[in-house]
Design a protein with these regions (language model features):
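Charged, gly/pro-rich active-site loop segments
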Residues: 19-120
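A short mixed-secondary-structure module that forms the rim of ligand-binding clefts
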Residues: 1-20
Length: 120
């Protein structure tokens, strides 16, 4: 999916400070390269078997026990492993107040952040 359309968006809200952040950017999929090899090597052995599942995550299964990854072939598990790296190019920051709200936007220009206050 990300190889066809690398756009991503994140939404965060902190109820204590009443701050909402929306961020946009793009993602790069790393598969069987130096990035994935380094991440795989750093991963605890006990976690690697989780990538050996035959059905993809979210696939319907008839029996809940089929959702447990078997210990087994590390090469097969690594074949299912990928690392996603992303960069943010736009941030929309909104602070909600009882009497007023404040909002700012930040756009990455390729070398610096352009920032502007905008109407909430």
């Amino acid at each position: 999916v990300f190889r066809k359309d690398p756009r991503v968006a994140w939404n965060f809200f902190d109820p204590q400070t009443k701050v909402q952040v929306r961020a946009h950017g793009s993602v790069t999929v790393h598969h069987d390269n130096e990035v994935t090899r380094a991440a795989w090597a750093a991963m605890p052995e006990a976690n690697k078997h989780n990538y050996a599942m035959p059905p993809a995550p979210g696939s319907p299964i008839d029996d809940p026990s089929l959702g447990q990854a078997p210990a087994g072939d590390e090469a097969a598990a690594y074949a299912n492993f990928a690392v996603l790296s992303s960069g943010i190019t736009f941030i929309d920051w909104l602070q909600l107040g009882d009497e007023w709200h404040r909002r700012a936007q930040f756009t990455w220009t390729g070398g610096d952040w352009r920032r502007a206050w905008v109407a909430p």
